[in-house]
Structures are given as C-alpha cells and as structure tokens.
Amino acid sequence: MTQIDYTRAAKYFLLADFFKGFKLGMKYFFAPKVTINYPHEKGPLSPRFRGEHALRRYPNGEERCIACKLCEAICPAQAITIDAEPREDGSRRTTRYDIDMTKCIYCGFCQEACPVDAIVEGPNFEFATETREELYYDKEKLLANGERWESAIAHNLELDAPYR
C-alpha cells in the first residue's frame, strides 16, 4: 500500500510552481527598464577603460615619450613601431611612433610599461573608420588624440593612481 503525499499533490493540482514562475515574470515585466538609448545616452566608463590610444605631452608642450621602446618590446601583437634619434642636449625623442590598430589587442601592456605615462589608452571607443588605412596611427594622430582627451586621461590616471 502506497502512502499519498497530500502536500505534493496540492502543489501539483493548484499549479503552485506555475504561479511562482508567473509572479517572477511579472516582477521583471513591470520593473524599470535598464536598456539605454545608446547613441543619445552613454553609460559610465571605468577609469581603467582601454579605448583609443593617445600620446601625451607635458604641460609645457614637450612630448612625454623618451623613446625607451619598452612599449614596442612588450606589445604581444607587435603593433607598435618606434624610430628615435638623439637630440643635441643628449635626450632621445621619437621621430616615428606608429601603432597598427588592426593588430592591437587593447591589452594595455604598453601603458603599463611606459615609465613616463606617454602612451595611454583613452576613453574614446567610437573610432570606426571606412578604410583600413585610417587604422594606422602615426605620431601626429596619436598626439592629436592626446590633446583632445588630455583632461579625461589625466582624471582617469589620477583615479587609478592608488592601484598602480
């Protein structure tokens, strides 16, 4: 003789699991929407966000890059090419600083390796192009990016400073 489990039978016939699921569905149906209207609204970015590359300058206008080539050496995708020559005062500066953005994997190693914070990955993530050639960044393009995003880059580096 089998014993009947009345609690289980009541749950089955009264559709308890169905109504639990229905209640959960209605909770999310009437909850406020979390989707943002992207082109018109933008979500917050982390200070560590790695976007479009930029070369920075010192406040006096001199470029920061000292041509140590650490970023070129550490780049796992070999996307960075640097040529440099010494100046009359003995310091070295780059004559060519190219980044092939089609190769770049946005790992951030170049930014971490740079001893003077010359190369950084800025907050810009909207840099789609129509041709492949526009993704080959030269020194002038990188310096222009640095000038355009300097305030945001400096703010993000300041926020990230305790963790570096």
UniProtKB/Swiss-Prot annotation:
Keywords, A to Z, come to: 4Fe-4S, Cell inner membrane, Cell membrane, Iron, Iron-sulfur, Membrane, Metal-binding, NAD, Quinone, Repeat, Translocase, Ubiquinone
List where in the cell it is found: Cell inner membrane
Q: Which reaction does it catalyse?
A: a quinone + NADH + 5 H(+)(in) = a quinol + NAD(+) + 4 H(+)(out)
The EC category is: translocase
Positions contributing to [4Fe-4S] cluster 2 binding = C75, C104, C107, C110
Instruction: Give the required cofactors.
Output: [4Fe-4S] cluster
GO biological process assignments:
aerobic respiration
Any one GO molecular function term: quinone binding
Q: How many cofactor units bind, and how?
A: Binds 2 [4Fe-4S] clusters per subunit.
Its assembly, as annotated, is: NDH-1 is composed of 14 different subunits. Subunits NuoA, H, J, K, L, M, N constitute the membrane sector of the complex.
What is the designated name of this protein? Answer: NADH-quinone oxidoreductase subunit I
Source species of the chain: Jannaschia sp. (strain CCS1)
User: Which gene is transcribed and translated to give this protein?
Assistant: nuoI
